[in-house]
Swiss-Prot record:
Abundantly expressed in the larval gut. It comes from Drosophila melanogaster. One of its GO terms (biological process) is innate immune response. Its EC number is 3.4.21.-. This is Serine protease 1. The active site is at 78 (charge relay system), 123 (charge relay system), 215 (charge relay system). GO terms for molecular function: serine hydrolase activity; serine-type endopeptidase activity. Belongs to the peptidase S1 family. Residues 22-35 form a propeptide. The gene is Jon99Cii.
Length: 265
């Protein structure tokens, strides 16, 4: 059922003259599978804040998102870009069996006003939803507090989740997958990517990665269970290529989220 947005990379052509390594620049391409690789099946209720998003517009495409309030979902701007509406799937462990769904139109999608589809700066969007009651299978994830807005989270462990394939070329799994990953510093990630300050990266050593994962989906810290990343892009070379996977850094958007939703910690 699910084909998740994945992002390919434009890589500079090699020349015969030795030169410093050139950083990679992301280029979004829709309708390519994202993947959770070398993860594990998430037990029912482990990730009650994740939603599956089926967008409609010029075609249909799938992304992930995170419940941050009774009437709000956070996702990626490259997911909402060009959408005329979205069906939100709540409480699914088996990807084809959500507890319930809601549909909302483009008027309830708030895409970051400075989103740049060329370099994926400000790759973040909000979706205003009908009110949902929280219970064991459908619940919110908390944002970082304002006291942590300058925290870089380097060295912290986090969990990413989604319904993407479990290895390069694999079919989509029926069951929600999670993977435990370590956040790396901006300086380490900048060796591979041309980064914006409001991006955050994970180490993919050992083939553990979202590799783009469910674009728009969550990266949540083990310590404190705070949503610190929104899945943005990964390497087109494959999920086990070793390149860091990149997320929008939620702490960089706390003011924007508060101004649009009233949610803050």
């Amino acid at each position: 059922m699910k084909l998740f947005v994945f992002l390919a990379l434009a890589v500079a052509a090699a020349t015969a003259v030795p030169a410093p390594a050139q950083k990679l620049t992301p280029t979004p391409i829709k309708d390519i599978q994202g993947r959770i690789t070398n993860g594990y099946p998430a037990y029912e209720g482990k990730v009650p804040y994740i939603v599956g998003l089926l967008f409609s517009g010029n075609g249909n495409w799938w992304c992930g998102g995170s419940i941050i309030g009774n009437t709000w979902v956070l996702t990626a701007a490259h997911c909402t870009n060009g959408a005329s509406g979205v069906t939100i799937n709540y409480g699914a462990s088996i990807r084809t069996q959500p507890q319930y769904t809601h549909w909302v139109g483009s008027g309830d999608i708030i895409q970051h006003h400075h989103y740049n589809s060329g370099n994926l700066h400000n790759d973040i969007s909000l979706i205003r939803t009908p009110h949902v009651d929280f219970w064991s299978l459908v619940n919110k994830v908390e944002l970082p507090s304002y006291n942590d807005r300058y925290q870089d989270y380097a060295g912290w462990w986090a969990v990413a989740s989604g319904w993407g394939g479990t290895y390069d070329g694999s079919p989509l799994p029926d069951w929600l997958q999670s993977v435990d990953v370590q956040i790396i510093s901006q300086s380490d990630c900048s060796r591979t990517w041309s980064l914006h300050d409001n991006m955050i990266c994970i180490n993919t050593d050992g083939g553990k990665s979202t590799c783009g994962g469910d674009s728009g989906g969550p990266l949540v810290t083990h310590d404190g269970n705070r949503l610190v990343g929104v899945t943005s892009f990964g390497s087109a070379a494959g999920c086990q290529s070793g390149a860091p996977a990149v997320f929008s850094r939620v702490t960089g958007y706390l003011d924007w989220i508060r101004d649009n939703t009233g949610i803050s910690y």
